[in-house]
Amino acid sequence: VAAEDFMTGVGRNCMEKGELLKMIKLPAPAAKTSDAYLRFIPRTEMDIAVAGAGVSVTLDDAGTCIAARVAIGAVAPTVLLVGAAADALIGTPLDDDALQAAAAAASAASSPITDRRCTAEYRRQIVGVLVKRAARIAATRAKGN
């Protein structure tokens, strides 16, 4: 089962009754590939994220993004892979315009709730900021800086 298909809902996964997960196999990353994960936790006494974002990028020798994946969490019932955000990064030097487009796509894909910790609108905004920051960090790491 592909990792992105494992979780099927809040507290649910694709395993049938009696099945046991015994191994997770991850491919080795390609050269000039790196990632970053950020989460926003406004209250230090609770380790519950208001929003989270993970970005993986692969760069060519010129520094152009040739592959990307963007995932967001705590802004929908399950973690979301946001293909439109990844597409906004691919083919670019990961400049401000590309990062802003990825952030906007992530915000648009989110479907957060309002709860005691913050409003849905705030979560929608902060997840875009986290995507932008995580993409910058991943790019810096992929360049070897």
For each feature predicted by the language model, list its residue ranges:
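C-terminal structural segment of proteins
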Residues: V1-N145
